[in-house]
């Protein structure tokens, strides 16, 4: 028989058990998670961007994640890719990639990284290839990015060629033949081309210019020692490039139109040529201005030579632009709505992406490729044969 004390302890224990069961049987309400930040309206802010945003490494990296990894970038025209195997290499905000026309006539884009040792697959600025071949260990790829040959590795147990193709980019060729890319690694990019640019390839003011009458002529590049947004501020007003035509040239080129395409591209059409320009971020305080020039089939040398004068004047203007990181740059209010609209878009995209990262408690890199489990296993196979240390493979591929 239990003593009185033992019986009391038994009763108390039973009460605790029953109370615990009642408590834990109640539905538990999960803590409410704050909603993800939403992009604000496109209303133009009256305040310019802070001067520190034009020289900060932190802002530069955030722009790579929030803008250049998510937005559509205007690159070139399909005129430059006239046949199967024709390719062009690009670098945009630190991303190295290339465009290539496949055997079906479709323009594809890929990160310029071999899946074996990250050596560049394309080493020339442009050309025509029969196959995409990495010169490091002989891996080769078809024009659709699929792995065609991986010496020795393709015979390893568990190696899946289908999982080791080149990392693709999203490519859109619009109705006028202009080529756009999006770095977002998702199967479907977060930002669709149509959401940003519907109708830009159907503008009535572009109709006088038949692009079938133009051919690619040359590229030009200029390195400058300030932030890419300084240039985009300038060119976001469509009239800026048009103003480079003065005097006699203006009379000869009465039909000249210019357009800016966020975040960093501009285009100018004339009856004699058209120019595509990009402000490419190289670093927080360094940029590259890159031109692609196309010539009309009927343009005389005299008319076409205007291009060099225009680029020369643009270069002189670029060198004279104020440096936004200088003291007192943003003490006043900018009154030109074009730069303010551009800056408002930059501000909204950076603040929105920063909010997402704060919620996730980590950096979000939309362009970063995510390997599935099979690909991760393949990567471990590569690491087991480091460098040229795999006997027979070393002798075969050590060129």
How does the language model describe each region?
Residues 2-10, 16-19, 23-25, 100-101, ...:
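C-terminal catalytic domain of Rieske-type non-heme iron oxygenases
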Residues 34-39, 143, 201-204, 251:
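Short, flexible segments with low predicted structural confidence
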Residues 50-51, 63, 76-77, 160, ...:
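Short, solvent-exposed coil/turn linker segments
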Residues 55, 163, 310:
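Soluble or luminal CAZymes and related metallo-dependent hydrolases
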Residues 70-81, 150-155, 258-263:
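Short Pro/Gly-enriched beta-strand edge/turn motifs at strand-loop
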Residues 81-185, 191:
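Rieske [2Fe-2S] iron-sulfur-binding domain
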């Amino acid at each position: 028989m239990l003593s009185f004390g033992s019986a009391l302890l038994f009763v108390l224990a039973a009460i605790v058990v029953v109370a615990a069961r009642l408590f834990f049987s109640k539905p538990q309400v999960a803590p409410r998670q704050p909603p993800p930040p939403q992009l604000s309206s496109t209303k133009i802010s009256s305040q310019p961007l802070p001067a520190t945003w034009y020289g900060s490494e932190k802002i530069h990296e955030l722009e790579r994640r929030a803008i250049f990894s998510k937005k559509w970038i205007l690159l070139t025209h399909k005129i430059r890719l006239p046949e199967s195997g024709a390719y062009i290499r690009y670098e945009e905000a630190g991303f190295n990639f290339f465009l290539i026309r496949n055997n079906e006539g479709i323009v594809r884009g890929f990160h310029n990284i071999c899946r074996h040792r990250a050596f560049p697959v394309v080493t020339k600025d442009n050309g025509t290839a029969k196959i995409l071949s990495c010169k490091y260990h002989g891996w080769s790829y078809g024009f659709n990015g699929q792995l065609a040959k991986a010496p020795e590795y393709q015979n390893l147990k568990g190696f899946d060629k289908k999982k080791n193709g080149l990392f693709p980019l999203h490519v859109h060729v619009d109705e006028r033949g202009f080529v756009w890319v999006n770095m977002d690694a998702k199967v479907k990019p977060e930002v669709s081309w149509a959401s940003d640019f519907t109708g830009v390839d159907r503008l009535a003011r572009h109709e006088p210019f038949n692009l079938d009458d133009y051919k690619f002529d040359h590229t030009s590049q200029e390195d400058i020692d300030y932030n890419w947004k300084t240039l985009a501020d300038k060119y976001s007003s469509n009239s800026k490039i048009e103003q480079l035509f003065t005097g006699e040239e203006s009379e000869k080129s009465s039909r000249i139109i210019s357009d800016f395409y966020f975040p960093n591209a501009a285009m100018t059409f004339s009856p004699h040529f058209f120019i595509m320009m990009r402000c490419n971020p190289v670093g927080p305080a360094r940029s590259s201005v890159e031109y692609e020039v196309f010539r009309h089939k009927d343009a005389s040398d005299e008319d076409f030579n205007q291009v060099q004068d225009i680029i020369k004047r643009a270069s002189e203007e670029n060198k004279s632009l104020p440096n936004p990181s200088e003291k007192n740059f943003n003490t006043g209010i900018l009154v030109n709505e074009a730069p303010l609209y551009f800056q408002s878009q930059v501000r909204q995209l950076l603040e929105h992406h920063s909010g997402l990262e704060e919620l996730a408690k980590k950096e979000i890199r939309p362009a970063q490729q995510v390997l599935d489990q099979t690909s991760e296993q393949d990567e471990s196979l590569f690491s087991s044969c480091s460098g040229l240390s795999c006997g027979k493979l070393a002798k075969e591929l050590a060129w």
